[in-house]
Amino acid sequence: ANGVGVDTPASTINILNWLAEAGVGLGSESRPEESQALMAQLLSGRSNDPESFHLRPLAYLPLNHYLRWWEKLTPVARALIEQRWGSPEQAVDLEEKGFAVHGLLLGHVAVLIQPSRGYDPDQISDLHSPDLPPPHRYLAQYLWLQEVHGTQLMVHVGKHGSAEWLPGKSVGLSEACGPGLALAPIPHVYPFIVNDPGEGSQAKRRGHAVILDHLTPPLGRAGLHGSLLSLEALLDEYVEARQVAAERCAVLEQQIKQLLQGLDWPSF
């Protein structure tokens, strides 16, 4: 749920609060006030997790709506997608009502989960693939934003999403390049960590994004906490007991085993 160096759910809540202060209607009943509530609402519906596919999505983009857009694409663009995913009618992610849109609708604001770039077990490879075209549902969700929801401003929260990594040219994108197919002519704002100008430039150059740099998070000394901190103390005491108080070892061993069982770890 987090972008690099930013708490994405908490940042999304902040953005929603700023929009509300600016007079944007967010609804009154279902608006989450904190990040845990936001994530709970998102995960109560359909997400990219296959185990959630029995849940209802936010909406559907009907196939006939998608086909009207599809027929306007260049033959080159259609061929690139069809070679990997087949025609829209053959799409593995097509349902009876159309292509599913995953997320929440809060008044005039849609908070969506970016679609998966592919359906391979190794999602990381799909995310960064220079050759994998976007599936039909990926394109359909962005089309829903543009033509059904009527989005006037799009915000991708945190480094980095997948739209700017879709196949195509590095600069001077053509009508067949993936980012242009997905993002459409919608103003695009992208909060991005300041210490990665290279990938920020990628989003700016290929995703027509206005980059809003944010600082890196403050650093702190890492350490153990909770049960792990107690385990460390018991292990230190056990090492000392083996040297000076062997009779104490049996008691410590039992305490360590109980703690490991509580952590659901195998004991010795």
In which residue ranges do the predicted regions lie?
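Ligand/cofactor-recognition surfaces for anionic moieties
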Residues: 1-268
